[in-house]
């Protein structure tokens, strides 16, 4: 059994925030694999289903991001899921929009949701780091992650969430590298078509050959000479 945690903040005011891409990914998974309905438990929302032949519990903590570890720890302990079998889906500033990285363990990288989980369960869980890009200035980070995705972001957001769901059985089976590679392949922009070389132009027809008049004068003079020869013969 796996515990798959999507991180975000509860409530409609935060629903489309960049910080809530983990919630969005969990929602797509639950719909794609026809999980049971969301229900309130473990200070969060929980849904159950099967992915790749494995029982999966999806969890969206409702504690607000900074206290996510309370909900994750409560679920993991009640369900007796070891930390090794927890997968956390979260937003990642240091990964480009539309890209992702997968890793096990490591630091929280300034992410308060991960810090909270670390404080309750340690760091040895898997993280799917869903790229949202960086605003370029640390002072802008808080406003950036709590701002809604733009309409234009749907061009990469929808494909990457679909690709994560489509490829999730590979992650369930433990093939983290294969999962990341496959998602990258599914979300890669199409290669531009190479322009075909222009067809070689057919050679221009040779100019018509015009016979030059006999040497020694004009055409009229040539005719006059010929007539003179005829008269002499007579």
Swiss-Prot record:
Residues spanning the signal sequence: none
Site (Discriminates between blocked and unblocked aminoacyl-tRNA): give the residues: 9
Task: List the residue(s) that the UniProt entry marks as the site Stabilizes the basic form of H active site to accept a proton.
Answer: 91
Which cysteine pairs make disulfide bonds?
A: none
Q: Which domain of life is it from?
A: Bacteria
Xref: InterPro entries? Pept_tRNA_hydro, Pept_tRNA_hydro_CS, Pept_tRNA_hydro_sf
Q: Could you tell me where the Low complexity compositional bias lies?
A: 199-214
Listed under GO biological process in this entry are:
protein quality control for misfolded or incompletely synthesized proteins; rescue of stalled ribosome
Give the CC-aspect GO terms.
cytoplasm
NCBIfam families xrefs: pth
* Quaternary structure and interacting proteins, as annotated: Monomer.
Protein name per its UniProtKB record? Peptidyl-tRNA hydrolase
Tell me what organism the protein belongs to: Paramagnetospirillum magneticum (strain ATCC 700264 / AMB-1)
Gene of origin?
Answer: pth
């Amino acid at each position: 059994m796996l515990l798959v945690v999507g991180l975000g903040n509860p409530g409609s005011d935060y629903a489309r925030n960049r910080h809530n891409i983990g919630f969005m990914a969990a929602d797509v998974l639950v719909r794609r694999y026809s999980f049971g309905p969301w229900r309130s438990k473990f200070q969060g929302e929980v849904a159950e289903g099967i992915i790749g032949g494995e029982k999966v519990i999806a969890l969206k903590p409702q504690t607000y991001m900074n206290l996510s570890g309370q909900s994750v720890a409560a679920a993991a302990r009640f369900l007796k899921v070891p930390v090794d079998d927890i997968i956390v889906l979260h937003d990642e500033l240091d990964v480009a929009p539309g890209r992702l990285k997968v890793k096990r363990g490591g630091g929280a990288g300034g992410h308060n949701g991960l810090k909270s989980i670390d404080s309750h369960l340690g760091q040895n869980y898997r993280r799917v780091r869903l790229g949202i890009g960086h605003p370029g200035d640390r002072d802008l980070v808080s406003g950036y992650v709590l701002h809604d995705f733009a309409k234009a972001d749907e061009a990469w957001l929808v494909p990457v969430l679909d690709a994560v769901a489509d490829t999730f059985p590979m992650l369930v089976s433990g093939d983290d590298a294969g999962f990341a590679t496959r998602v990258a392949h599914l979300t890669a922009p199409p290669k531009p078509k190479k322009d075909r070389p222009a067809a070689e132009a057919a050679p221009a027809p040779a100019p018509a050959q015009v016979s030059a008049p006999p040497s020694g004068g004009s055409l009229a003079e040539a005719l006059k000479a010929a007539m003179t020869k005829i008269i002499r013969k007579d």
